[in-house]
């Protein structure tokens, strides 16, 4: 009998408390970068009933109305009704942003490689904003080269948001979660969806029967290809029986609490660093994007069916301390060849990544819900497949 395995990933909507925090942090980052592309930003957000606290470190000469950015972001998400216990115009906003530590700044502004060196490469100037390890991943399970469980989970909560904002389902409220369990065959290929879990906040008048019917018909069956669904697929829709109190009224939220949702749904390893609120000198963010860029181009070049890239850095040092690529036995060339090619083709110094992916632009708010990787609805530079030919040539 062939061995089949299950794998599960989850996603959350833009109205989930942790995602509200992520979106506020990235909206602040974008507002600052729009006025000062050289700014250093580390903006953290905490949300709870009736309150938003924004704190962290920034280095910029630009003025940004933090209060307005916070309120506009909350309104765009859909928290405009005081009945939700959290509303854009009535929430208390408490900013507390201070200047970046000069001890950190000296290592970021002048990397170890150029200190005391008159013959400087401009891309050696910026040192990594912290030590750490970052992972990027790609797999040929979907068109966007993402694991199927997280890809479907994102699409389910995005569909819920579309139906809410268009008022096609008028009783929906902003907070929601999804979870998809996929069955894989003995060759590690997805064959069917075993279980779908969706919890969506709703008005008190909505009945469980109506929610169940609408979610299956207008969300699940609109998003998940019928070839993955069968009579054994299990659906759990609002399994607690009621989800009226939600968002920050139901749970507090913090920036950086959904790092697995932001990446690969647990299918690949994670270095532990969050993305939102951080400018691109923070390698937690920029190197994770670079690692995805490498992995996706490797898989798109048919050099592997599955690729995981690890990068690691020392604070204040420009060059990565290590580059590792794992193809899990699916590669068509040696992993050492891929590692050598990656170092040749992709500039993995922080300034090199920033230049390669044009990361000084205000592009981050759009990434802060529904995943930073595998997005097909927006143009993200780390999702481009413009290094395929160079990789093929490098490993000949």
Swiss-Prot record:
Its cofactor is Mg(2+); K(+). GO terms for molecular function: ATP binding; magnesium ion binding; methionine adenosyltransferase activity. ATP binds at residues 16, 175-177, 242-243, 251, 257-258, 274, 278. InterPro entries: ADOMET_SYNTHASE_CS, S-AdoMet_synt_C, S-AdoMet_synt_central, S-AdoMet_synt_N, S-AdoMet_synthetase, S-AdoMet_synthetase_sfam. The keyword Transferase applies. Mg(2+) binds at residue 18. Residues 100-110 are annotated as: Flexible loop. NCBIfam families: metK. Catalyzes the formation of S-adenosylmethionine (AdoMet) from methionine and ATP. The overall synthetic reaction is composed of two sequential steps, AdoMet formation and the subsequent tripolyphosphate hydrolysis which occurs prior to release of AdoMet from the enzyme. This is S-adenosylmethionine synthase.
